[in-house]
Amino acid sequence: MLDKLVAQYSAIIESLGEDVNREGLRDTPKRAAKAMQFLCRGYNQSLEEVTNGAVFESDTDEMVLVKDIELYSLCEHHLLPFIGRCHIAYIPNGKVLGLSKFARIVDMFARRMQIQENLTRQIAEAVLEVTNAHGVGVIIEARHMCMMMRGVEKQNSVMSSSVMLGSMRNNPSTRSEFLTLVHSRRAL
């Protein structure tokens, strides 16, 4: 696959009128191909692999929230990055997930070409699948380079998307607690 990507990046560079053999660009097709493989490595990962059995029995039945998980993804429309933060909460149902696994789930889905709305849903559904939680809430806030570097060129826009499942969707007080906790900004 790497050789095919290298050839395609060479063709793109030449199509833009550049000399792919000039000093500054000579290794660019290979570097760009490797970068794209890294940025899309989520296609080669599975939920079972990234969670690695880190689900533990627990009597905890109150909300668990992990805030400000940084994420980097590629918009499927322009192949430009969007960069942001993900907040995940769940109401355990006899099981809790190892803390680092939330970041791994976010990365697995973020390292694919897609739109933010789908990314938000994929993360929520994965957490629900792994934990069998009573409820799951996910909010992503991100800046999209496709809107900042091209098109309307708006530098300060932030897109927010949310998915609420189970009690996070059906119980207004649970949903409100999640939103309040996400929006509280207390320095540690």
UniProtKB/Swiss-Prot annotation:
Residues binding Zn(2+), per UniProt: 75, 78, 146
A Pfam family reported for this protein in Swiss-Prot or TrEMBL: GTP_cyclohydroI
GO biological process, one term: one-carbon metabolic process
Catalytic reactions of this protein: GTP + H2O = 7,8-dihydroneopterin 3'-triphosphate + formate + H(+)
GO cellular component, one term: cytoplasm
EC number: 3.5.4.16
Assigned protein family: Belongs to the GTP cyclohydrolase I family.
NCBIfam families cross-referenced by the UniProt entry: folE, PRK09347.1-2, PRK09347.1-3
Protein name: GTP cyclohydrolase 1
Organism: Hahella chejuensis (strain KCTC 2396)
